[in-house]
Amino acid sequence: MSKSEDNITKQVKEMYLKYPYPSPSREISETNELVNLLKIFEIENKEKIEKLKILDAGSGSGHRIINVAKYLKNCSFTGIDISENSLLIANELKNKEKIENIQFLQKNILDNNTEIGKFDLILCMGVLHHLSDPNKGLQILSKMLNKNGMIFLYLYGKLGGHKRMLNKELISIILGKDKTDYETGIKIVRDIGLNKFDYGWNLKCESIEEENSLIVDSLLHANETLYDSITVNDLFKKSGLFGYAIFGISVGTNGLLFDVGSKNNEKLPIPQTNISKKLNSKSVLEKYEGKSIREKYRILELLYEPNGYTIIGFTKEGYEKLSNERIKRNFIKID
């Protein structure tokens, strides 16, 4: 048993034993959000991701990270997850796809995992917010970065996640005391028509099994913490990192690149936040331009109401080698 396997961790582990996510029947070609994100990062940073040692913290059933390992053939990958069942699926998928540059290990993010080494890039996408102690989780992961390292996080958004949380509460009340009765919970979700999903879960399900995994992950999860720009800043303040920047946000069923600037990169054919269109007033925009980065973050999230944030945390050396101008505009140094 893991040293940090508290009651919440045990519940999450049991949940994924019954309902691994993504579902084992899901094709990796249909879970390409993470590889697309890294491709965008490469385009904007004008540099290929090559020969890096990469950790995927919370691999689940491995679909997304195997897709990435397939793309970044010159990088070496380690995927960790607390669920033995999920890792069995991940290894089967790895063998099926003939991927040789990744290993999977059963580890708890909340444990001191120094024996697996340090990494140039850490991915923790949609996982930290499920930990019993996200602050501790980020602190531990930050210590596993090399001196010029970066960490990508995906965190649930409080503003855009409000309706989903109301739906979760509704289902929980109807379900009653036994919150681990996922079968009944799934039936309730279908019976009242709540089996529709936001960006991140918004996948076309080919089977009941796939949809069951989505329902459990989005509406019956044992534990989650939602964030806004204020609590994101609190999270990073305690991380030991040099600073961070919001890379992108999810809004409803769409993903947007995040930019505090008032002029977008029109050469990049990808949807982006656009403060000029949202405010649509020269005098108000002038006031906006005079605000701090954190105030701009808050204004943008109040206008867009994200249900999720993709965030990059940097070591000092990792930030100094960055050439991505949009991320530099968005960067917040931790005091």
What is each model feature region?
Residues 98-110:
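Conserved SAM-binding strand-loop segment of SAM-dependent methyltransferases
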Residues 135-147:
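A short glycine-rich, Lys/Arg-flanked "PGG" loop and its adjoining helix->strand segment in the class I
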Residues 152-195:
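Conserved class I S-adenosyl-L-methionine
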Residues 61-73:
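Conserved SAM-binding loop of SAM-dependent methyltransferases across substrates and taxa
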Residues 18, 28-50:
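Conserved alpha-helix/loop element of class I SAM-dependent methyltransferases that forms part
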Residues 113-121:
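A short acidic, Gly/Pro-enriched loop at the edge of an enzyme's catalytic core
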Residues 83:
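Conserved SAM/SAH-binding beta-strand->alpha-helix loop
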Residues 206-335:
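Rossmann-like AdoMet/SAM-dependent catalytic core
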